[in-house]
Amino acid sequence: MGVLRLRVDGQTFRDPDNREITLRGINVAGEAKYPKKPDIPSYVSDGFFDADNVSFVGRPFSLDDAHTHFSRLRKWGYNTIRYVFTWEAIEHEGPGKYDDEWISFTIEVLRIAKQYGFYVFLDPHQDVWSRLSGGSGAPAWTLYAAGFDPRGFKKTEAALVQNTFDDPAEFPKMIWSTNYTRLVSQTMFTLFYGGRDFAPKAIIDGINIQDYLQGHFIAACRYFAQKIHEAGDIENEVVIGWESMNEPNRGLIGVQDISVIPPEQQLQLGTSPTAFQGMLTGSGRACEESTWAFGGFGPYQTGRELVDPEGETAWLPADYDDTRYGWVRDPGWKLGECLWAQHGVWDPSSDKLLRKDYFAKNPQTGEPLNYDKFTNTYFMEHYRAYRDALRSVWPEAIIFCQPPVMEVPPDLKGTVDDDPNMVHAVHYYDGITLLTKHWNRLYNVDVIGVLRGKYLTPAFAVKIGETAIRNCLRDQLKFLRDESLRYMGTHPLIFTEIGIPFDMDDRHAYKTGDYSGQVSAMDANHFAIEGSTANGFTLWLYTTSNNHEWGDNWNGEDLSIYSVDDLELPSGKLLAFENESQRDPQSPAYSESQRNTESYRVGPRDLKQALQAPSISSEISQSSQDKLGFRAAEAWVRPSPIITNGQILQYGFDLKSCVFSMRLLGEKKGLGQEAATEIFLPDFHFPDTHTVVAVSAGEWTIDYPEIHSVKFQRLRWWHPEGDHNIKIQGVKRKPGDPTVSGEELSYLEQCQGGGCSVM
């Protein structure tokens, strides 16, 4: 293989010219979580249980539509895609039965992404294990392999599933994530990571269920990787690497007492069973469970509720035909009985708990366990096998290691796992905003500080006022960056998921067009990213079919930056071109490179007209009462360094004043094309007739490169070596209001008359 298009150099990404690359990306796409044929979003029940006979061909979008979506994302300044796929998409029909049609289709989608110059890394996505357990990810047959009967999940509350909820429209917001602490997900993750230790009787096809599940998952991903390798034009040219399994979870491993809620369990919502209560209701017993709601300071108990399955169980009956998928279950593993009862955790004849600390230590060795021990042993054992399988196909693959969310990362620094071609993949969400679906300008909480024991009491973690909240988000992300260097070693860090809900305040913005709350929340998250010194991010999420009624069409989530029911900010195609001869060649802003680059200007009047006639999807589904808005685009369509000739020291965008600033340590490379630092400069904020640029040294120009017919605005800066800075002033606007005030234009005109270099 030739020169790597993107390589890891310590904690930095570099291009073939040795310049620093910042990954500014997006997750593509939400539809990848559920099948295309039949089309079964999480609010549809028809055909839900026939999960073997599905197809993901056409996910996340058709080949015909791929150009529309990739060009849109490129126009918005994204250069990176976290490409979402599921294990189910590859191996839904049964163990070892791969969907080659889906793989071939995906390779064609990746070829189209290549035409737009994206860096793509592949995300084997899961949420709470599987679609049939209320999320996405693993094929349905994995549940049957573990002895579960998905049709019994509803009555037992072994998993809360929107598809089987009585009224899917009333499915409680964000309750899907509580499935991580319900029977099915707890069991599946325990078996996947620790079945040999905790379920030695679970033998299938002569091996433990841990090896069976992990073996099939890794083999499926390796098969996919091999097909990409054989394609010959995907590796390195568009796909730069693979992420490990999305949001791994310990299940029950390390839980000290299954008769109580673990003190470290942060989320409680709706009914909140202990692990033992989940085992009882999963076996048909009635239990009175505490009920919880989520408020401004976190979860609080609201009462108690009787969960009565009336004898129905979450386990397959003893007479189930276990030949369906061709495996042979060991006679010592009985169907029709809770797997944990079979391992002596509790007695089904008396319903008594026998070993409340069964998962607190390794049953085979007696070694004490906690979440850190899980991460450093069980998680890492799987990660190594996954990494090595993919590297056996493509040795140069960058592996994005994603440890358990919000937990201390594995201690790899200076060990054999301190892999120079590894990237730390981190997820972060502002939990209060996500769960309450409200941007609270009054207070927020330093969640990471609480989790890491920074405060004597959580009361000290409360941050008052929007400035303090923004700084708190930034400081949490900066802490995670520094923590990564301490534990993982010197590697790049990418926030591969971060985002906000758009259906805030009972969908107020959809009724009024006022996205000011979303703008503030999204801007605060980007402010945090920019201040964290991370190497980039992939925002969650882009969903092609997002709409005001069902959001992302998955569990009531509504995090997509795009919706068919909202407007898009105007693209360069809507802006009026200017005759190049009108430019003054003597102007300091004029350079030789501009003479060879197609450029255009837009005035305030043209901009306002363009904003009133935006480009939107041809498919509109919103109700007639909805008022179209710009979906907080002014907060996420923002300037960013893309290529830096040297080392980034600091950068950020002040949305309120519309000022981008950047400080760097430059390297001397001359004045060639490969020597420039490049900044994505969205023309929405920085129309070239009203943009003021100030640099400490060097020359700069604004041009409009074209990638596969997509034009975007870029600032290129040739600076000397050493410590230098740039400041770019654009057009100030009120949050949610795309128009330009006379006062703001007057300010810019004064800047123009002050001798600044103006584009």
Swiss-Prot record:
Source organism: Aspergillus fumigatus
Disordered: annotated segments: 576-600
Annotated gene: egc1
Catalyzed reactions per annotation: a beta-D-glucosyl-(1<->1')-N-acylsphing-4-enine + H2O = an N-acylsphing-4-enine + D-glucose
Lineage, top ranks: Eukaryota, Fungi, Dikarya, Ascomycota, Pezizomycotina
Pfam families to which the protein is assigned, alphabetical: Cellulase (PF00150), Glyco_hydro_5_C (PF18564)
Single GO molecular function: glucosylceramidase activity
Localization terms from the record: Membrane
Protein name in the entry: Glucosylceramidase
Coiled coil: none
Enzyme Commission identifier(s): 3.2.1.45
Assigned keywords, A-Z: Glycosidase, Hydrolase, Membrane
GO biological processes: ergosteryl 3-beta-D-glucoside catabolic process; polysaccharide catabolic process
Active site (catalytic residues): 247 (proton donor), 497 (nucleophile)
The keyword Membrane belongs to this UniProt entry's keyword annotation: yes
Family the entry assigns: Belongs to the glycosyl hydrolase 5 (cellulase A) family.
Recorded superkingdom: Eukaryota
Bilayer topology: Peripheral membrane protein
InterPro entries: GH5_C, Glyco_hydro_5, Glyco_hydro_5_CS, Glyco_hydro_b, Glycoside_hydrolase_SF, Glycosphingolipid_Hydrolases
Membrane in keyword set: yes
Chain intervals with Polar residues compositional bias: 584-599
GO cellular component, one term: cytosol
